């Protein structure tokens, strides 16, 4: 039963939402009202609408379908060349976008931080760019002979003029003897980067899995199966996250045969269907391919969470339960090994952080997955929301958040600022677009997209870094220096009086 004081807080937060909405014209207010709510315990849903186009004219943090395909799913595949097919301006999302760490020699056998563009000009819009794209792929294969394949990431003009990139892909694939994957991920498609994820997943299904089927049929799969093979999917190795996750999986006796897509390779994409279990970290961006693997190959899949010691231990046990007693015993040994280490981290940082509050606004999985990590440190989440979630994301979020938590979907810059002013959280955890706004308001901030150039945050080792970074953000002595001297003097005089 909800305590009376929490009932009051629910009502208070609902009133806050209505107050914030008053700034909009009636039509916009009605639209935005559906995306804002206060979570009430025992509800199976957060009660917000999602995956709907943003209200025209507002400041939204969303990206486009091209960003979802190139910047998230395909871009981190390190041994493929990813062509940004269109004007060079979209290159903002084309290189060094997400700190996807990888092992390899850039420009020789790895291309993760390189920018390849067809540099569309006006004449290409008029006459079409198929010949230019064909020549580009041929030249790139000569310049970088160790590439394993090419992906064509379409920008807006490609879809508008109707270039046949599929025909180019089939033709050039035969010429260079490597996979060439076309992606219709033009930025105008869909309402956010989420459709780009879906398009990217479908391209793996339609253009990569047939290669697996062919190799298996011809008995040419260079793969020795084991009963402990898993595919690690939806981890983009931001700051080394996938390595931290992989280390724990291997320590408990599992073999990671495919890592998608941070530090991943084309071969790992191809042999993904050979795994016994799919472990998905970022549900939003890769649940589509998990469902395809289940439908086509009968592969089971599960979402896991390696943020914070509480959820790490729970996830290790859930994963181990899918295997035999050997793996289950190993999981317990891994948990026992790291428990004293985590206790030492908590003993050091929890007293310094306990009682603080945080408001989250990120994409993907983090608005829910990082909640337990904050709670392990004694930090309470008072608001959370997604940039591009779907309804099932918000259903999954109910298992993570407390009663009276403010929920905001595709929150506008205005709304987020007003919520922060009213709730006065001690910390904001969001993205680069929000960072400097709140820092100028004198609020501690941590980036939850790129970890503010820190990390990893996954796994036991990552939690120690996470705790340190939250402590640095909240307890930095610089916060005592941001007040204007005349305001400090006035405050002292008032206190003395």
UniProtKB/Swiss-Prot annotation:
Question: Zinc: is it a keyword of this entry?
Answer: no
List UniProt keywords, sorted A-Z: ATP-binding, Iron, Iron-sulfur, Metal-binding, Molybdenum, Nitrogen fixation, Nucleotide-binding, Oxidoreductase
Q: Which domain of life is it from?
A: Bacteria
The entry lists its GO molecular-function terms as: ATP binding; iron-sulfur cluster binding; metal ion binding; nitrogenase activity
**Catalytic activity field:** N2 + 8 reduced [2Fe-2S]-[ferredoxin] + 16 ATP + 16 H2O = H2 + 8 oxidized [2Fe-2S]-[ferredoxin] + 2 NH4(+) + 16 ADP + 16 phosphate + 6 H(+)
Listed under GO biological process in this entry are: nitrogen fixation
Q: What is its EC number?
A: 1.18.6.1
Q: Does the keyword DNA-binding apply?
A: no
Gene3D superfamilies under this entry?
A: Nitrogenase molybdenum iron protein domain (3.40.50.1980)
Q: Which Pfam families match?
A: Oxidored_nitro (PF00148)
Which note does the record give on the cofactor? Binds 1 [8Fe-7S] cluster per heterodimer.
User: Which InterPro entries does the record cross-reference, listed alphabetically?
Assistant: Nase/OxRdtase_comp1, Nase_comp1_asu, Nase_comp1_CS, Nase_Mo-Fe_asu
Per its database record, what is this protein's job?
This molybdenum-iron protein is part of the nitrogenase complex that catalyzes the key enzymatic reactions in nitrogen fixation.
Q: How does it assemble?
A: Tetramer of two alpha and two beta chains. Forms complex with the iron protein (nitrogenase component 2).
The record ties this protein, via NCBIfam families, to: N2-ase-Ialpha (TIGR01862), nifD (TIGR01282)
Q: Which family does it belong to?
A: Belongs to the NifD/NifK/NifE/NifN family.
Protein name, entry field: Nitrogenase molybdenum-iron protein alpha chain
Q: State the organism of origin.
A: Nostoc sp. (strain PCC 7120 / SAG 25.82 / UTEX 2576)
Organismal lineage: Bacteria, Bacillati, Cyanobacteriota, Cyanophyceae, Nostocales
